[in-house]
């Protein structure tokens, strides 16, 4: 079962007050409900592929309204042959839709969220919970990117959901998709806040555990990569230094170097694997710091490059013995 499915399953077990149940129902029906007319009856079908969600919608309707409710199961014939669960109302539909602020007399469907319906903080939470159950999704925190979204067919309703989420400072944004609109979150911290808002405590804790472990692994990897890069840089520098010193040795001899450069050159080619700090401690003329050793080695690099470019030892400042 996916992380999103586990989250929704957790939400279907929540106990809520009657007022919050109405708000949750309103969000779900607005997004997943369909109205049809037959023999002067207004029939409402609320559809989902999630059995636990279907049971919750059925139970909430049954607890709130004394009307006959049907729970039907259909099987998809295309693509994934999943079951489709339909909660159907054949009587009292108009009154229920008006009570849920989805329908206004005589028969006008509202396009946004009734502000009075979500005045209380708990009602705001309930509406977002219903919207997420209806058409929400959230990436597994172990995947490469964090993403939570709620899909809506209608732009006005999508904007209302975004505004409702941002009343909780979630930094939600909207985006148009091929068949509708989404309100989405990309920040891990905001996703955990949203899960807390809708009451998905277990999902929140799992998300945070995985996120912390993932961030720790990323930090370790960055540290290892940094240390590896530094090691490679050190090795490459040592190889270059030794090559340059050997070039000086083969062309003019180390004896042509000033004493302070001659000693470090001899130590470097005799101790290829030691660090700059260790080289500094080997000098017979007195210990020299890492920066001091590095400065001398850079001077040797410059001498080698100038000799390679065709300059004479005298031009470089070297004295060649005639003996």
From Swiss-Prot:
One Pfam family cited in the UniProt record for this chain: HTH_WhiA
GO BP: cell division; regulation of sporulation
Keyword Cell division recorded: yes
Cited SUPFAM superfamilies: Homing endonucleases
Cleaved signal peptide residues: none
MF (Gene Ontology): DNA binding
Cell cycle keyword on record: yes
UniProt keyword list: Cell cycle, Cell division, DNA-binding
DNA-binding region: 275-309
UniProt-listed HAMAP family: HTH_type_WhiA (MF_01420)
Function: Involved in cell division and chromosome segregation.
Family according to the record: Belongs to the WhiA family.
Protein's recorded name: Probable cell division protein WhiA
Organism: Listeria monocytogenes serotype 4b (strain CLIP80459)
